[in-house]
Amino acid sequence: MRVQPTLIERIIVAQNDDPQLMKIRNSVEAGVQSEFKIHEDGSLRFDNRICVPNDSALKHEILQEAHQTGYTVHLGGTKMYRDLKEIYWWNNMKREIAQFVAQCLVCQQVKAEHQRPTGLLQPLDIPVWKWEHITMDFVTGLPKTPSKNDAAWVIVDRLTKSAHFLPIRVGFTLERLAKLYMKEIVRLHGIPVTIVSDRDTRFVSQFWKSLHKALGTKLNFSTAFHPQTDGQSERTIQILEDMLRTCILDMKSSWDEHLPLIEFAYNNSYQASIGMTPYEALYGRRCRSPIHWDDVGERRILGPELVQQAVEKI
């Protein structure tokens, strides 16, 4: 059994009702038009991007799916355009995406809430490998959920910008945070070499000791830390906080149940600071989602080629 969305099929059918696209198709079939191609599935494509007809309902469905579903969580206009332009093409696409996002009431509310000046930030050295140098911060003041969570712990890899969101309570002890870090982060990425945090130095030092206690090691380790995040890390934290707060406006008191999808949405969306999605930097390609179903399916990279491409991208 092959699972695939019906959206592409509906776009192909609707292309036949669009006069402009039919004119282009006729030119392609006559060998006149070179920028456009007819794909093996019968769709008209521009640079391998499927051409979306001038159908307001169809375009609205695509924009809605790319902006405010559980796995996208109100991405900004630039991120939406970067993501969608890899798969879809239509006239004035960038402008229509910007207009769609500008009209989103949830986005307007969140953007207005976090306007605040930032201090002087010191640049940090670029890491040489994934998840060895991390940034951590806490998003507090969140509504208490039925599970009693009222904060989110944000942990970001400074190289790939990939991140994890962990629901917590403000009153969690350092020992409990260390055990949670070991359970959710160490098992996937190992132990960090440096920790960047806006928290005071005592917090980082005590957290480091608690982490090694949770690991059960008797070896003595030391780690570097920075008392203030760099510009890129602070921006990443702000993006994640915005996504959290939009989710809260949509999901209300059950926001912690949606954290896995918020995490996925962030990691699978374009980040200007690295020129790709965090998943691409981490794994070599973006992960499959309903809106990127066919895009991922057409790229089959395995073994050494996948590793090499991931290394080249970062």
Residue ranges and their predicted role:
Residues 1-314:
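Integrase module of LTR retroelements
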